[in-house]
Amino acid sequence: MKANIHPDYHKITVVMTDGSQYTTRSTWGKEGDVLNLDIDPRTHPAWTGGSQTLVDHGGRISKFKNRFGNLGM
């Protein structure tokens, strides 16, 4: 196996949408960083059986609809 080709694993804190926290090892960020989740398994419609609503991060869905909305069937 080649040496020094794998990313560094370190401990981060993950904060769920309800405020609960847990510590895990990850390649994301730096040691001690905090990852705040916008959606997690406790609130995601695929896992809760709730309504299928879309979260428009940065207006991406709106931008897509404006660009391709007139191509309706």
Curated annotation (Swiss-Prot):
InterPro entries: Ribosomal_bL28/bL31-like_sf, Ribosomal_bL31, Ribosomal_bL31_A, Ribosomal_bL31_sf. GO terms for cellular component: ribonucleoprotein complex; ribosome. NCBIfam families: L31, PRK00528.1. It comes from Bartonella henselae (strain ATCC 49882 / DSM 28221 / CCUG 30454 / Houston 1). This is Large ribosomal subunit protein bL31. GO terms for molecular function: rRNA binding; structural constituent of ribosome. Binds the 23S rRNA. HAMAP family: Ribosomal_bL31_1. Belongs to the bacterial ribosomal protein bL31 family. Type A subfamily. Part of the 50S ribosomal subunit. The gene is rpmE. Keywords: Ribonucleoprotein, Ribosomal protein, RNA-binding, rRNA-binding. One of its GO terms (biological process) is translation. It holds the Pfam family Ribosomal_L31.
